[in-house]
């Protein structure tokens, strides 16, 4: 079913990339490496390109029912994120989301899409970063930062650069937070 919707969005992006058409898709997006989830992520990216509007608020609610991006990130399954670090998909690219949809792995339903986690982390760091030491600890417990570190070995330079930037931002935010606590 998702494949059919995906084809329709690709053929008629001007007509289909409307908030009223994209919003119903967000609850079925799980952020995994399943082909259907990758197709949905491509639809969301197509929406952003067509409408020049962020779809981040839709994705925040879709994965965990969270009210904001930080809660969505903190509600990621740490075991699944760690599993994604171990079985990292080397073919996944940040700048080429529409390709490799034919690639499938038996664990895809149990792995997060590193692109999704990276984009969610970027949104959190840009909009609503953790504000307390407890939230930072919870963030590290999700293994999302570990996935950023693992993504540094990606073949895709854009993904590597994005992750370096995010890790740098995390380090700066931690230095500022702890300087306020101890300085």
Predicted regions: what is each one?
Residues 15-16, 50-54, 80, 92, ...:
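Alpha-solenoid repeat scaffolds
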Residues 14-23, 97-98, 136-146, 179-183:
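Core helices of alpha-solenoid repeat scaffolds
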Residues 23-30, 99-107, 145-153, 183:
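HEAT/HEAT-like alpha-solenoid repeats
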Residues 70-102, 112, 116-128, 177-183:
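Long alpha-helical HEAT/HEAT-like repeat alpha-solenoid scaffolds in very large eukaryotic proteins
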Residues 13, 19, 24-27, 78, ...:
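Proline-rich intrinsically disordered, low-complexity coils
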Residues 1-9, 18, 32, 36, ...:
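HEAT-repeat alpha-solenoid elements in large eukaryotic scaffold proteins
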Residues 140-183:
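Helix-rich alpha-solenoid scaffolding regions
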């Amino acid at each position: 079913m998702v494949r059919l919707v995906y084809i329709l969005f690709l053929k008629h992006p001007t007509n289909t990339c409307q908030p009223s058409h994209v919003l119903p898709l967000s609850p079925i997006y799980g952020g995994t490496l399943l082909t259907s989830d990758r197709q949905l992520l491509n639809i969301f990216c197509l929406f952003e390109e067509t409408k020049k509007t962020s779809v981040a608020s839709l994705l925040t609610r879709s994965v965990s029912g969270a009210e904001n991006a930080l809660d969505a990130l903190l509600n990621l399954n740490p075991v699944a994120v760690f599993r994604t670090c171990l079985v990292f998909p080397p073919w996944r690219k940040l700048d080429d989301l529409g390709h490799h949809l034919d690639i499938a792995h038996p664990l895809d339903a149990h792995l997060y899409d590193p692109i999704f986690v990276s984009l969610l982390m970027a949104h959190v760091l840009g909009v609503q970063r953790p504000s307390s030491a407890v939230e930072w600890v919870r963030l590290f417990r999700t293994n999302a930062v570990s996935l950023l570190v693992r993504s540094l070995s990606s073949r895709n330079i854009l993904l590597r650069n994005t992750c370096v930037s995010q890790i740098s931002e995390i380090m700066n935010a931690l230095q500022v937070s702890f300087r306020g606590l101890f300085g």
